[in-house]
From Swiss-Prot:
PANTHER family, alphabetized: UDP-N-ACETYLENOLPYRUVOYLGLUCOSAMINE REDUCTASE (PTHR21071:SF4)
Name used for this protein in its record: UDP-N-acetylenolpyruvoylglucosamine reductase
Substrates-to-products reaction catalysed: UDP-N-acetyl-alpha-D-muramate + NADP(+) = UDP-N-acetyl-3-O-(1-carboxyvinyl)-alpha-D-glucosamine + NADPH + H(+)
Organism encoding this protein: Rhizobium johnstonii (strain DSM 114642 / LMG 32736 / 3841)
Pathway: Cell wall biogenesis; peptidoglycan biosynthesis
Function: Cell wall formation.
Localization (cell): Cytoplasm
Domain FAD-binding PCMH-type: start-end pairs: 36-203
Length: 324
């Protein structure tokens, strides 16, 4: 369903937008942004030129206008009805940097790919970042959800997060203030992460290269890295592996519409070509149902679902009652 509200929303922001240097796009297709390559339109998409431009935009954005932040699009599923309000997509030019910030320290912009941080660390003999080479996505998302791989989590290397709130005020959050747990932080969802400071330890480059090669080889062997996918679909329940539960429930390779649970790694949902947001979310909820009926375990989404459903194409979330 094509939205027609973007121009109206842009006009409502008044003359203040004339001073904005970033790109403002009404009715922006989200299927060009997400790694799933599916979903509806963003009513208005804003890509700030830099942090000052971001602050200026936030100060003219009315409080009642919804604001949704997306990173590189690797861990989100956008519904077919699109995303009302403003979608904030940080630009690579202003937020994609990675640089040294002192002995064994690295500062990375929120949109910087995780693997670029791993590469910077290796080039400078800084250990502890090899796991980032196996995580698809950007540093802001990794900091937000405490992303991890190969037994290492983001919180183990993170010193502080730099952020801006909805009013345009700047904040710095320490590791402790992030309130980390497994694939979660308690940081306010109103905060927009702009950069992250990390600290590693001295390590030989050859050793780091070997660790990164092992991560890459493992990922390419067991994950559908060349498919349209958002990464791990569900969190691992305590004491269990999500992929194993999905496999035991008979959902490996399960297809709904244009969406499939990967036959290579069944905790990865893939767009086989023409999947809609509805197909993907319906498939995920069906897997949650099948796993619960088999093992009594309720899987939690790791993929974020954003936006609104198309009328008549709503997906009912499974709440753990088999009679639903």
């Amino acid at each position: 369903m094509k939205q027609v509200n973007g121009e109206k929303l842009l006009a409502s922001l008044g003359d203040g937008v004339k001073d904005i240097r970033g790109r403002i796009t009404p009715d922006a297709p989200m299927d060009r942004v997400t790694w799933f390559r599916a979903g509806g339109l963003a009513e208005l998409m804003f890509q700030p030129h830099d942090i000052d431009d971001l602050v200026a935009f936030l100060k003219i954005l009315p409080e009642e206008v919804p604001l949704t932040v997306v990173g590189v699009g690797s861990n989100i599923l956008v519904r077919d009805g699109g995303i009302p309000g403003v979608v904030l997509r940080l630009s690579a030019k202003g937020f994609g940097f990675v640089e040294l910030a002192g002995e064994n320290r690295i500062l990375a912009g929120a949109i910087c790919p995780d693997k670029h941080v791993a590469a910077m660390a290796m080039d400078n003999g800084i250990g502890g970042f090899h796991f980032f080479y196996g995580i698809p996505g950007g540093i802001g998302g990794a900091a937000r959800m405490n992303a991890g791989a190969n037994g290492v989590e983001t919180r183990e290397r993170l010193i502080e997060v730099h952020a801006v709130d909805r009013k345009g005020d700047k904040h710095v959050l320490s590791n402790a203030e992030m309130g980390y747990s497994y694939r979660h932080s308690t940081a306010s969802t109103d905060l927009i992460f702009t950069s992250v400071l990390f600290e590693g330890y001295p390590e030989e480059r050859a050793q780091i290269r070997a660790e990164m090669d092992a991560v890459r080889n493992h990922r390419e062997t067991v994950q559908p890295v060349r498919e349209k996918t958002g990464g791990s679909t569900f969190k691992n329940p305590a004491g269990h592996s999500a992929w194993k539960l999905i496999d035991e429930a008979g959902c490996r390779g399960l297809v709904i519409g244009g969406a499939q649970m990967s036959s290579l790694h069944c905790n990865f949902m893939i767009n086989m070509g023409q999947a809609t947001g509805y197909d993907l979310e319906y498939l995920g909820e069906q897997v949650r149902r099948e796993v619960f009926e088999k093992d009594g375990i309720k899987l939690e989404w790791e993929i974020k679902r954003l936006g609104v459903f198309m009328p008549g194409r709503e997906v009912r979330p499974f709440h753990g009652v088999t009679s639903e």
